[in-house]
C-alpha cells in the first residue's frame, strides 16, 4: 500500500486574508501531535497551542489525542463510533491552530 501525501488548508486566527496561505504536505501515517508540532514551527508559534479540525459533521472538533494518525479508510468510522475516536481528517477540511494568549487564556470560541 502506497502512502499518500495530503495537504490541508490552514486557518490562522487574527489573520484576515493571506495572499498565499502556508501549505504543508503530510502523510496519512503522520500523527496529530506531529502535525501540530510542524504547524507551530511553520508559523513560529512559541506558546501552548491546540489543534482543531473544522468542517466535520460536529462543526469544530478539538484534536486531543496526539498519537492518532491522520487516517482515512474503511472501518475507521466504525472504530471511531465504538471507541469514541475523533473522525479522520480529510483534505476538504480546515485545520485551526490556536495559540494561548500572553495572559494564559485561549481565544474565545
From Swiss-Prot:
> Which branch of life, at top level?
Eukaryota
InterPro entries xref list: Ub_USP-typ
Query: How does the entry describe its membrane topology?
Result: Peripheral membrane protein
- The record's region (Interaction with GGN) falls at 24-109
- Gene Ontology cellular component terms for the protein in this record: Golgi apparatus; membrane
Where it sits in the cell: the answer is: Cytoplasm; Membrane; Golgi apparatus
**Pfam families linked to this entry:** Ubiquitin_3
Q: Which UniProt keywords apply?
A: Cytoplasm, Developmental protein, Differentiation, Golgi apparatus, Membrane, Spermatogenesis
Q: Which GO terms describe its biological process?
A: cell differentiation; spermatogenesis
Fill in the subunit field for this protein: Interacts with CCDC159. Interacts with GGN.
Q: What does this protein do?
A: May be involved in spermatogenesis.
Name recorded for this polypeptide: Putative gametogenetin-binding protein 1
What gene is this protein a product of? Answer: GGNBP1
